[in-house]
Amino acid sequence: MTERVLVLPRDRVPGGYDFHGLRPADGAALDTLRVAVMTHGMYLDRPVAEDDPSHKQLIPYVVVRDGASVFLMHRTDAGGDPRLHGRASIGVGGHLNPVDEGEDALMAGLRREWDEELVTDWEPRFELVGLLNDDTNPVGAVHLGVVFTVEADGRAVAVREHDKLVGAFAVADEVAASWERLETWSSLVARELGLGP
């Protein structure tokens, strides 16, 4: 069965989509986005959505911090999207699917992605950072990130799918050492968080 993903028409992105990088947002902006999703969001077959830049696939994207460190992951070749093999990331997240449907699909999908991708024995507290847009490459052209941070406060975090990801907390110098392999979104967010060269 073909995966269906939540998309928002470009012209319905609150505040517009004509920006590059991370646009800071607050709770009011998140509420506006939620209303836009409830009003104009729709599900498309993923293969169709991947080739349709008139729509943005919404991706909740979470960066886990522990003080000055960030959870840095390296993707293996076992991951699903070959465009991302061998790349590094400071965020976890993924597509919103019909299983997330309801009054707050965005937050339901965010929580589902957290549980699918990470192993923790504590409850995360998601803090909105902003919207992330990058139309400079084929992956970014069809996605819109909704970026959150979570503070680990010294608590353990591990990746769930060891065959697809390897992860550990890293300080700014370690993130900088992986800079050339960072996915575009990760480099944009890392720079905003003061973790880039």
Identify what each model region corresponds to.
Residues 166-168:
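Basic polyanion-binding and macromolecular-assembly surfaces
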Residues 1-158, 172-197:
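N-terminal leader/linker segments that precede catalytic domains of diphosphate-processing enzymes
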Residues 160-163:
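Short amphipathic alpha-helices in soluble, non-transmembrane regions
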